[in-house]
Amino acid sequence: MRPRARVLASVLVLGGLLVGCGAHVPPPPPVGLASGLPRVALLPLENLSTRNDAGDRLSRVFVGVLGEARVCQTVQPGDVDQVFMELRIRDANGVTRERVPEVARRLDAQWLLAGTILEYGSVRTADGEVPSVGVTLRLLDARDGRTAWSAMRVITGDDHEGLFGMGRVRSLDQLSERLARTLLADFRLPSPRDSTSTAGARR
């Protein structure tokens, strides 16, 4: 190889190594992990806010955070919408406790997450407007619709504000992600043994 070509090849290899070191690539999930986890479907959120896009935006955030936690498989929102259309269910209010098993069976899910958007927008403070997000969530057992877990949280952009405005969140998307992580921090699926014991106690 000519000296000039050898130098050029070395530069290209070094450049590739530097790019690889600088880029952050999340590690792939362990082989077989996802297929062994229970499936959870997030139903369309009831939207009590004034923003028509709140449901879609928050659903994407919650599905993403749940996926990162690797405690369950999340059913894609598009699949949920398809089942709702096939069953002629207009919104989550149409999923009564009696219909939970049917919906879950169509989604091949062991658990359903239902919830309500209480707030999605901004509130006026002495220092100006800040984003505000509030959500309730309930985990429903696919067999009978019982509530196995629930949580509620309302936060604003200045909840963690410190001196000189440090820590204030001004982005609604950023605040939504913070809410989802906070709300799901203690999210755990009941173990099969606990679920079976509870079901037996209801007979």
What would you call each of these model-derived segments?
Residues M1-V11:
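Bacterial N-terminal signal peptides that target proteins for export
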Residues A9-G20:
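Bacterial N-terminal signal peptides
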Residues C21-P38, R105-L107, V130, L140-R203:
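C-terminal/domain-edge helix-coil "capping" segments
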Residues L37-R39, P44, S49-T116, R146, ...:
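N-terminal segment of the mature soluble domain
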Residues D53-G55, D127-V130:
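Short glycine/proline-enriched turns and hinge-like loops at secondary-structure junctions
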Residues T116-G121, V154:
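Generic short beta-strand segments
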Residues S122-A126:
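Extracytoplasmic/secreted cell-surface and envelope-processing proteins
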Residues P131-V135:
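Short, surface-exposed coil-to-beta transition loops
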